[in-house]
Amino acid sequence: INQGIVLEKLSTGAIHFHETTKSDIAQACCDLYQQSPENSRVMAPTKALVADINKLTQEAVNPNGNRLEFEMHGERFFQNLRLNDAILFTQNHYDKGIQNGSLGVLTSVDASGEGYGEVTLDTGDKIEVTQAVLDCMELGYAITLHKAQGSQFPRIIIALQKGRIVDRAWLYTAITRAEHEIHIVGTEDDFKAISEAPSHSHRRNSYLAELLKG
């Protein structure tokens, strides 16, 4: 991919291509996620698409979890985050052990003292959900590639949409987030256009050839 070569057979080795119309990409990613929730993460190029996929996926895999609730000025509010949801943190709070892009699971929605519940990070660390922490929490079934930073996941589902930031390097980087299995969801035309067009950034060397041999 990084050399701009499109494979005739789009599902090869550890990479699986799923031909999907633009309007069905979010649902297709949600369906693929459900096949192996504990190993999967969806990568999408825009916050809007991430939000769509997260909403669908929460409804599919965790519709009945108890919602996180908190009190402010004597009133009770519910956050659309449920017990056992995948969680993404969007700001740095080094004093609390989280940074922008940290991932975890909401493992408690029991309020105590200043806290509304608890998130267990992928590292195993437990984070108390205070108001400051809650303000930078969102669903994390799907995330932008930018938020993935250096993280890797056993199984990656890539929502592929042509757009300003999506080029060959973006797709290549998304693929390198996967340890074992990659699912690319989108139209074949978009896949070819993105793969064949010169990248916005410099080429990168990688283990992609090994993945394709699979």
What function would you assign to each model-found segment?
Residues 1-98, 107-111, 115-117:
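Conserved helicase motor core of P-loop NTPases
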Residues 2, 53, 100-214:
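C-terminal accessory regions
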